[in-house]
Regions:
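Rossmann-like adenosine-cofactor binding region
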Residues: 54-126
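Conserved S-adenosyl-L-methionine
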Residues: 25-30, 121-125
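NAD(P)-binding Rossmann-fold cofactor-contacting core
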Residues: 26-52
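Short, flexible coil/linker segments at domain boundaries that flank nucleotide/cofactor-interacting
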Residues: 1-3, 26, 97-98
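Adenosine-phosphate binding glycine-rich loop
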Residues: 4, 100-102, 106-163
Length: 163
């Protein structure tokens, strides 16, 4: 439940915008938008400030990012770590991943990214990118067929592929 939570969001593209707006509408209190492009990052900050009640600030990503002590949720909405470049890692100070954090990665292939493996090893609760992929698929199938597919079956089928 994102109600009242403070979020660090890596990225400012389409996936980041969707995640940020949904978290804000669900009650997230504030966002640190961490992005290399100041212009794109600031556009997301302005969107959040003008369309939601959440506070938002842009943080320039100039080196290993340290997760602030007051943050509750960390989300990677970049393509860093996406197949085939699965060994790529966020420029993140991994020592700042604390057990009480929820760490989510929008990447669906591989489902268990370097970020998520590291977060799990540090006791964090993790959320993989398959959920976003599956829910996009559910919406697409509903749109085209008028029928609602079983999201759990879709997720299990994707996992069975062992991508």
């Amino acid at each position: 439940n994102p109600q009242g939570k403070r979020v660090v969001l890596f990225g400012a593209g389409g996936a980041a915008r969707a995640v940020a707006v949904e978290l804000a509408l669900a009650g997230a209190e504030s966002f640190h938008i961490v992005n290399r492009s100041v212009e794109r990052g600031q556009a997301l900050v302005e969107l959040l400030r003008h369309k939601t009640l959440a506070k938002a600030e842009l943080v320039a990503w100039l080196g290993p990012y340290r997760i602030p002590a007051d943050v509750d949720i960390v989300v990677n909405a970049t393509s860093i770590g996406l197949f085939p470049d699965v060994d790529a890692t966020l420029d993140l100070d991994l020592d700042t991943l604390r057990p009480e954090l929820v760490v989510a990665d929008g990447i669906h292939n591989p489902p268990l990214t370097h970020l998520l493996r590291t977060a799990q090893s540090r006791g964090c609760r993790t959320v993989d990118g398959l959920g976003m992929l599956v829910n996009q698929g559910v919406i697409g199938v509903e749109y085209w067929t008028g029928r609602t597919p079983n999201a759990q079956v879709m997720r299990e089928s994707l996992l069975a592929l062992k991508l």
